[in-house]
């Protein structure tokens, strides 16, 4: 609805194939208006200086190594973390990321190493355990991942898919403003967590 040339998104506007055209679908709106979309999804998650670097920096964690490597690219990080327990790290994530709710297990467990993976990273639990992490911090964690983590001696912090990736907007907007002073960059007002909690 605004005058722009490009929409830059983390999640692709067309994430799965379109089976029907719905008038309010963002892909339909963009196509009808002749607008362009550029999505930086898995490539930004895995890139050096990308999503997981930004997430670790916000949490005050320094990456030591990739949490999981595939095809020469890393996914998530293992970070050293001394003098904090799981509950304290969960609270830090809630405060720094602006989460309304953070779910976690094993709150009193002391942390020496933490696995960090933005978005939906429950699949990184085995890698976190294998790298000696006491906790995995990610989003979209299913109940069975919490149970598996407990059985492996690894706590899990679920700070939410939206909140562990929403950091993309401010980061990319800031980078674009710094590199292109004449470029108008706006963060969409529709960029919000639509999930309600009671």
Regions found by a protein language model. Give the residues of each.
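Active-site catalytic microenvironments in core metabolic enzymes, especially phosphate/sugar-handling
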Residues: 1-198
């Amino acid at each position: 609805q605004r005058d722009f040339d490009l929409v830059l998104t983390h999640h692709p506007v067309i994430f799965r194939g379109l089976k029907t055209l719905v008038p309010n679908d963002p892909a339909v709106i963009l196509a009808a208006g002749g607008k362009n979309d550029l999505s930086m999804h898995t490539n930004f998650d895995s890139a050096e200086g990308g999503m997981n670097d930004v997430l670790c920096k916000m949490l005050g964690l320094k990456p030591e190594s990739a949490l999981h490597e595939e095809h020469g690219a890393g996914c998530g990080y293992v970070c050293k973390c001394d003098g904090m327990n799981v509950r304290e790290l969960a609270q830090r994530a809630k405060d720094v990321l602006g989460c309304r709710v953070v779910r976690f297990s094993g709150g009193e467990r002391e942390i020496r190493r933490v696995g960090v993976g933005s978005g939906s990273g429950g699949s990184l639990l085995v890698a976190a355990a294998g790298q000696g992490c006491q906790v995995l911090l990610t989003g979209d964690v299913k109940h069975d991942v919490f149970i598996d983590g407990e059985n492996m001696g690894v706590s899990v912090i679920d700070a939410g898919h939206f909140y562990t990736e929403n950091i993309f907007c401010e980061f990319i907007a800031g980078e674009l403003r710094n590199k292109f002073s004449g470029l108008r960059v706006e963060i969409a007002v529709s960029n919000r967590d639509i999930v309600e909690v009671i």
